[in-house]
Amino acid sequence: MTLLEKINETRDFLQAKGVTAPEFGLILGSGLGELAEEIENPIVVDYADIPNWGQSTVVGHAGKLVYGDLSGRKVLALQGRFHFYEGNTMEVVTFPVRIMRALACHSVLVTNAAGGIGYGPGTLMLIKDHINMIGTNPLIGENLEEFGPRFPDLSLIHI
């Protein structure tokens, strides 16, 4: 099965569950997974039930997709994500974001637990830039025109 076929199958599965056109995607990392419990009129789907979806193995990641209303907006929240360091391929790591795009979501907020000098527990930090030093990236492989150009403009990614 091609990546596009997997994306279409997963999108169709979620749409059949009532998950449609979220205004915002939330990828909730360690410490913020409970935010999904604030979502009203939730549709909750376990990762294990979603076709082509990876499995979250990090302690504290509930492994659930939650869709509904948060502050009057339709959101799709992911309680946990998949990490490259866990042995996942970039296809698995990026698959949830591709699904959000397939569902017509155009804005995604990614959270994670991070440490640094001068920051205490619970401090919010905003990423302004990044350098990819892992030796691979999700652009390797077939370019899916449905998801944009081969080399997207990243100059405004951290807004």
Where are these regions (language model features)?
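Metabolite-binding pocket within alpha/beta catalytic cores that recognizes anionic/polar moieties
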Residues: 1-152
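Conserved small/polar residues in nucleotide/adenosyl-binding loops
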Residues: 157-159
